[in-house]
Amino acid sequence: MSGNKMKMEFLSKSQNESFARVAVAAFISQLDPTMEEITDVKTAVSEAVTNSIIHGYGDREDGIVKIQCEIFEKDITIIVEDDGIGIEDVKQAMTPLYTSRPDLERSGMGFTVMETFMDELRVESTEKNGTRIIMKKKLKSIE
C-alpha cells in the first residue's frame, strides 16, 4: 500500500474526543493493525485531544481542534493541533504527574501515556498561539 491521509476539525467540546479517536482508528484500519495497536493509537489520540480541549481552550467550547493523519506503508503520523493558550514550558508539561489544572481531578499523565503508546512524540507550542502534538507509530506486520 502506498500512502493516504485525512484531515478533520471539530469544536473543543469534550464529547468530540470519542469521535476523534474512533475516526482515527477507522482511518488506520486500512493497514490491518492488531487490536493492541488500534487501542494504543486510540488512547494516544484521546489524550492529545483531551489536552487540547481542557488545557488549550479551558472552558471555551468554540475553539477548533484539528487532526491530520497520514499513513505510508506501516507508518502512521498523527498531528493534533489547537489555537489555544499554548504551553509556557513544554518540558515541564511533559513531566509525569505535572498538571496545569490542579483544580480538575486529572493525573498529569497525558504526555506520558502518549509517549508510552506511540513510538515518537513531539510537542510544539507557543504561549498564546496554540499547541501542535506530533505522534508517530510504526505498525508491526502480521505475516
Curated annotation (Swiss-Prot):
EC class name: transferase
Keyword ATP-binding tagged: yes
Reaction(s) catalysed (UniProt annotation): L-seryl-[protein] + ATP = O-phospho-L-seryl-[protein] + ADP + H(+); L-threonyl-[protein] + ATP = O-phospho-L-threonyl-[protein] + ADP + H(+)
InterPro entries assigned to the protein according to its UniProt record, in alphabetical order: Anti-sigma-factor_SerPK, Anti-sigma_F, HATPase_C_sf
Molecular function terms, GO-annotated: ATP binding; protein serine kinase activity; protein serine/threonine kinase activity; sigma factor antagonist activity
Keyword rRNA-binding: no
Any Pfam family matching the protein: HATPase_c_2
UniProt entry keywords in alphabetical sequence: ATP-binding, Kinase, Nucleotide-binding, Serine/threonine-protein kinase, Sporulation, Transferase
Single biological process term from Gene Ontology: asexual sporulation
Documented EC number(s): 2.7.11.1
PANTHER family: ANTI-SIGMA-F FACTOR RSBW, ANTI-SIGMA-F FACTOR RSBW-RELATED
Family: Belongs to the anti-sigma-factor family.
Known function: Binds to sigma F and blocks its ability to form an RNA polymerase holoenzyme (E-sigma F). Phosphorylates SpoIIAA on a serine residue. This phosphorylation may enable SpoIIAA to act as an anti-anti-sigma factor that counteracts SpoIIAB and thus releases sigma F from inhibition.
Protein name: Anti-sigma F factor
Species assigned in the record: Clostridium novyi (strain NT)
